[in-house]
């Protein structure tokens, strides 16, 4: 028995009833054993189960104690809900009461509609409050009362109180048993016997009373436990069911109550819109009246009074500043004798709890206050005085405050004289910096990097549309959205700031010190290009604000434009289509295409559909992996406009890992500006810094180390091909009179003039002239392409890169030349359906060799990897004496050759008699690359204006390398194998004229200004070397060959003559005679006449509408792509017209 008691003490409180141990007894077993003992005490085995009863009671007591603790916590939580609900009901009743009173005020002030609405909402609140009160009563009656009854009744007290009667009965039984056991052993000892064990049967009769008491207390305890089980289980759950029904009734009744007002609420919403419109109109009229009164009074704001000051505070400060005529500092005026620079010591009050004065070394220079720290290893703090205000302390004559944009500095000078000096220097330095900023000047200590930044900003401001605000059209915007690349006015920029940096990040071009990395998008987007996408679907009437619009109108429009993308063009129907467009935009390096998919709501950091270097690559991974110094703007746009820079590929590599793996320090700079997580590891357990160290990428390692230590400067410079505008152009003296203005009027884009083969890769498309976007053409300068090689599929001279001219007719798939034509100096062979962009250059001509039309262009140094324009200021090629010629002179050859070729193969013009003179073209190939926006017709016209239409005497011809034989007749020329294209379908072409229609030897004056297509085709079919065949679709619309001037035909005639008569050269590389010397321009002032070759419908009021075949008298030039003139004989029909839509008449 003692051992049983000791075992009971080892039980853990964690044991539970449903995890009974073997020495416990169940209720059914207790009943059976007790009944048996009651009927037959001597044969019963109940005494052996006494220990089990004791163990069972102990474990039951522990379980009840655990339940008591849990139910007390439940009761506490429910009471808290009830109390807070009562408070909520009381607050709702108060709210309903004051709302009803407020509505009554409206009813008494001739606003019955608004008053009724407030009263109805008050009634609704009261009804809902009543329902909530009923719900809380149900909670109190069903849950709280039940828990209170249980905890204060059956479970009252502490652990062990319930089993005290049982413990007493157990103790009495054990005492009596010990006493009888001792007596039996003594009795046996007296008779010389030893009793080792006493059975229950022997003492059954003697212990019956104590055993019956034990059984009674055990039975009482089990009955009590059973009652508690019922109350804490079944009864409590039944009351929770009642509360559940009360909750259901609460929500159902609440919904019914709210539905009663549904129709009224819908009608009220419409009425409120009309009321708001009326009130807005009143406000607008009052605002206009206020501004009118203010302008007439010219009062200082302090004299106007509190009402005006309050209205100023509520209105936009930016709006009020923009209406001021000039800037007035309204601040301290320092003593100019102290200058604007000073070094010394000041006492600065610390920001800690103690607020102690600390002595700090300070310096003022170039508008910057430098405050050194106590330790020399920390970088000093630098404050831009332009954004600070100096405020003297009225209480202490030696103290003053410096209020910056984010904190206030408290300074104290050593004495009053030193105080005056510091105040004066700070004020003078700030005033000096402000004056320099307003005048556009810079400090004397600027370096080349600041010069570059200034040049970039100037170039950005010259982009199309950047002279007005992107949102409201205000002139001269100076606030830049660095993540969108657009310029806004100060009023609209304030709304951009309110939207948050995840939508638009605003910086000032004048007040902020920008790094070149913050100008990447501004250099490549521009307001016009951005609005072509984001405002493509503006409704009519347009909701776009004007410069005079108030802030409410601006905010509604800007939010719809930038947050909702409500006015953008939609081109993709599904998310997969958007991802495909995103992939193509990155591959083709097309920023505008990227902005288009961004406007359509694509998730920029979604894994791309096409597998890349690693599974799970995003567009940013791909952009970084393929980035170079020409595509950083794509990386910048993705970095600034995507949400999560920590996206990982399938192997755990983030974009930072890619920068280290592929050695992209410039991309890394752009990424670190947005503060991504730098310590993410991939599957190999490496961070981006670990990879940079392993691969010895020192630049990436340094940048990542700076970012990890928090020392990275976000205003960082990036190495990028800026392609800035060149101010000093390589031009002759004759050009100075006609030099166009650097800022051009932007017009609606015309069809592109470059046709490309489908085999061109997306990366190479950007290098092709036809793929230059209007914004690129507007900002690239005269010399931007002097060092550039445009690789096309068929040309020995680059086609004009302008996109303003109509498209050239493409070659049909089955009509390409089958062999290398004789006039293809680059050795290019074109197939029927595909072409290549890699051209092999021939060796340069030997020294002394004169340049002719059949020679290839001079080898130019290769441009940067993007095949775009390389940095400005470089010249190439040997310069001849004709360098100072008219700027259109050297491009006359390009006008003839490029216009006579398709995108799939060269087109050789029909030959003309050799009497027609050629110009000297020593620098034609060089100059043909200079102008990027001038169509071929422009140069053709200029060349005709600058030369006398007469033939030089034969004696002036230079020596010829090969003597030319007499010119054979057309019918005597047999076709050469490989030179003739397949015969065109005659059914698709106009009737062929007879050969007799062609003059045998036309003079310059006899040449028609516009030969017919039939004449040229007749020559081609009769045996002339010609690779030019127009598609039937183009022939039916217009005669493209008719665009060529007689000079063009004469040049090709001599070129073809040379190829036929040279016997010592191969057919594919003919030798041509040296062209005739160039004549001096003496007819520069003659009237210029042009003939229209296409129909043109005016897009703007000042443009000229015409049809094909009309003659226009040129009266001026708006810029190099748009001329001014009127229809011949109809001077009332005048306006500007595109040069690429006309053909210059030679007269």
Curated annotation (Swiss-Prot):
A zinc finger (C4-type) spans 469-492. The modification Phosphoserine is found at residues 732, 741, 854, 858, 1026, 1045, 1059, 1146. GO terms for biological process: cilium assembly; negative regulation of dendritic spine development; positive regulation of membrane tubulation; positive regulation of podosome assembly; protein localization to cilium; regulation of postsynapse organization. Residues 792-803, 824-837, 892-903 have a biased composition (Low complexity). ANK repeats lie at residues 615-647, 651-680. It comes from the Eukaryota. Pfam families: Ank_2, ArfGap, BAR_3, PH, SH3_9. Keywords: ANK repeat, Cilium biogenesis/degradation, Cytoplasm, Golgi apparatus, GTPase activation, Membrane, Metal-binding, Phosphoprotein, Repeat, SH3 domain, Zinc, Zinc-finger. May function as a signal transduction protein involved in the differentiation of fibroblasts into adipocytes and possibly other cell types. Possesses phosphatidylinositol 4,5-bisphosphate-dependent GTPase-activating protein activity for ARF1 (ADP ribosylation factor 1) and ARF5 and a lesser activity towards ARF6. May coordinate membrane trafficking with cell growth or actin cytoskeleton remodeling by binding to both SRC and PIP2. This is Arf-GAP with SH3 domain, ANK repeat and PH domain-containing protein 1. It comes from Mus musculus. The gene is Asap1.
């Amino acid at each position: 028995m003692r051992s049983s008691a000791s075992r009971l003490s080892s039980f853990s409180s964690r044991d539970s009833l449903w995890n009974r141990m073997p020495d416990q007894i169940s209720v059914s077993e207790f009943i059976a054993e007790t009944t048996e003992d009651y009927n037959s005490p001597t044969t019963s085995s109940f005494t052996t189960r006494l220990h089990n009863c004791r163990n069972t009671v102990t474990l039951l007591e522990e379980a009840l104690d655990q339940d008591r603790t849990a139910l007390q916590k439940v009761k506490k939580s429910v009471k808290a809900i009830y109390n807070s609900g009562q408070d909520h009901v009381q607050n709702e009743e108060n709210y309903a009461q004051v709302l009803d009173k407020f509505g009554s005020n409206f009813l008494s002030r001739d606003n019955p509609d608004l008053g009724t609405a407030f009263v109805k909402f008050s009634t609704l609140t009261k009804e809902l409050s009543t329902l909530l009160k009923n719900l809380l009563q149900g909670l109190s009656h069903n849950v709280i009362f039940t828990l209170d009854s249980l905890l204060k009744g059956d479970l009252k007290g502490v652990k062990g109180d319930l089993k005290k009667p049982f413990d007493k009965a157990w103790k009495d039984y054990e005492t009596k048993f010990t006493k009888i056991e001792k007596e039996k052993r003594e009795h046996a000892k007296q008779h010389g016997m030893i009793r080792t064990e006493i059975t229950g049967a022997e003492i059954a009769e003697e212990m019956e009373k104590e055993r019956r008491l034990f059984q009674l207390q055990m039975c009482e305890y089990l009955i009590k436990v059973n009652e508690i089980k019922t109350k804490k289980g079944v009864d409590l759950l039944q009351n929770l069911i009642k509360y559940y029904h009360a909750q259901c009734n609460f929500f159902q009744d609440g919904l019914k109550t709210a539905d009663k007002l549904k129709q009224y609420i819908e009608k009220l919403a419409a009425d409120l819109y009309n009321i708001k419109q009326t009130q807005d109109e009143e406000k607008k009229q009052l605002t206009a009246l206020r501004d009118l009164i203010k302008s007439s009074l010219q009062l200082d704001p302090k004299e106007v009074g509190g009402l005006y000051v309050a209205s100023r505070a509520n209105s936009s400060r930016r709006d009020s500043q923009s209406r001021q005529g000039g800037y007035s500092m309204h601040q301290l005026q320092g003593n100019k004798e102290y200058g604007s620079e000073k070094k010394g010591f000041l006492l600065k009050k610390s920001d800690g709890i103690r607020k102690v004065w600390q002595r700090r070394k300070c310096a003022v220079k170039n508008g910057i206050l430098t405050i050194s720290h106590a330790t020399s290893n920390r970088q000093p703090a630098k404050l831009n005085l332009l954004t600070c205000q100096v405020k003297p302390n009225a209480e202490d004559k030696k103290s003053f405050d410096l209020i910056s944009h984010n904190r206030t500095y408290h300074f104290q000078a050593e004495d009053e004289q030193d105080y005056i000096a510091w105040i004066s220097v700070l004020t003078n330095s700030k005033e000096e910096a402000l004056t320099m900023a307003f005048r556009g000047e810079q400090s004397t200590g600027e370096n080349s990097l600041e010069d570059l930044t200034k040049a970039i900003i100037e170039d950005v401001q010259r982009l199309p549309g950047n002279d007005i605000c992107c949102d409201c059209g205000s002139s001269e915007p100076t606030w830049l959205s660095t993540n969108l690349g657009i310029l806004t006015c100060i009023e609209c920029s304030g709304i951009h700031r309110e939207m948050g940096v995840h939508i638009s990040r605003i910086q000032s071009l004048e007040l902020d010190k920008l790094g070149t990395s913050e100008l990447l998008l501004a250099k490549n987007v521009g307001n016009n290009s951005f609005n072509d996408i984001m405002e493509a679907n503006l409704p009519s009437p347009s909701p776009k604000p004007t410069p005079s619009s108030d802030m409410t109108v601006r905010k509604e429009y800007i939010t719809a434009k930038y947050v909702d993308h409500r006015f953008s063009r939609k081109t993709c129907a599904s998310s997969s289509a958007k991802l495909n467009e995103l992939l193509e935009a990155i591959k083709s390096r097309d920023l505008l295409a990227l902005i288009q998919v961004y406007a359509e709501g694509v998730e920029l950091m979604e894994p791309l559909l096409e597998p890349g270097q690693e599974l799970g690559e995003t567009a940013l991974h791909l952009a970084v992996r393929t980035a170079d110094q020409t595509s950083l703007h794509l990386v910048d746009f993705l970095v600034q406009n995507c949400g999560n820079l920590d996206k990982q590929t399938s192997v755990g590599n983030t974009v930072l890992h890619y920068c280290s793996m592929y050695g992209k320090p410039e991309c890394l700079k752009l990424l670190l500006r947005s503060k991504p997580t730098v310590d993410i590891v991939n599957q190999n357990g490496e961070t981006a810094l670990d990879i940079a160290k392993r691969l010895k990428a020192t630049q990436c390692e340094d940048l990542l180390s700076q970012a990890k230590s928090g020392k990275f400067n976000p205003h960082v410079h990036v190495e990028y091909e800026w392609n800035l505008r060149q101010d000093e152009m390589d031009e002759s003296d004759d050009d100075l009179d006609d030099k166009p203005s650097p800022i051009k009027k932007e017009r609606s884009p015309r069809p592109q003039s470059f046709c490309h083969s489908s085999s061109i890769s997306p990366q190479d498309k950007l290098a092709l002239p036809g793929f230059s976007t209007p914004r690129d053409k507007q900002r690239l300068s005269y010399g931007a392409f002097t060092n550039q090689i445009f690789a096309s599929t068929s040309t020995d001279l680059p086609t004009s890169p302008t996109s303003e001219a109509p498209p050239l007719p493409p070659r049909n798939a089955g009509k390409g030349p089958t062999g290398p034509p004789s006039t293809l100096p680059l050795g290019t062979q074109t197939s029927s359906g595909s072409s290549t962009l890699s051209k092999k250059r021939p060796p340069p001509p030997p020294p002394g060799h004169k340049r002719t039309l059949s020679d290839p262009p001079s080898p130019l140094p290769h441009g940067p990897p993007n095949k775009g324009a390389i940095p400005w200021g470089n010249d190439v090629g040997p310069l001849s004496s004709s360098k100072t010629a008219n700027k259109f002179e050297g491009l006359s050859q390009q006008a003839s050759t490029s216009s006579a070729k398709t995108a799939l193969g060269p087109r050789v013009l029909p030959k003309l008699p050799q009497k027609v003179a050629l110009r000297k073209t020593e620098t034609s190939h060089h100059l043909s690359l200079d102008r990027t926006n001038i169509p071929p017709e422009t140069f053709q016209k200029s060349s005709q204006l600058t030369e006398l239409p007469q033939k030089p005497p034969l004696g002036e011809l230079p020596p010829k390398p090969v003597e030319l034989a007499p010119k054979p007749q057309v019918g005597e020329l047999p076709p050469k194998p490989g030179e003739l294209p397949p015969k065109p379908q005659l059914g698709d072409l106009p009737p062929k004229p007879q050969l007799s229609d062609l003059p045998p030897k036309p003079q310059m004056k006899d040449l028609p200004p516009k030969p017919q297509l039939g004449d040229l085709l007749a020559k081609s079919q009769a045996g002339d070397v010609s690779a030019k065949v127009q598609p039937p679709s183009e022939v039916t619309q217009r005669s493209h060959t008719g665009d060529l001037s007689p000079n063009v035909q004469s040049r090709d005639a001599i070129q073809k003559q040379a190829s036929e008569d040279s016997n010592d050269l191969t057919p594919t590389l003919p030798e041509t005679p040296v062209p005739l010397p160039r004549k001096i321009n003496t007819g520069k002032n003659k009237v210029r006449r042009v003939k229209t070759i296409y129909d043109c419908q005016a897009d703007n009021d000042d443009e000229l509408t015409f049809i094909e075949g009309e003659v226009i008298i040129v009266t001026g030039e708006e810029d190099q792509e748009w001329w001014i003139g009127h229809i011949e004989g109809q001077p009332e029909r005048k306006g500007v017209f595109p040069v690429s839509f006309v053909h210059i008449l030679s007269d």
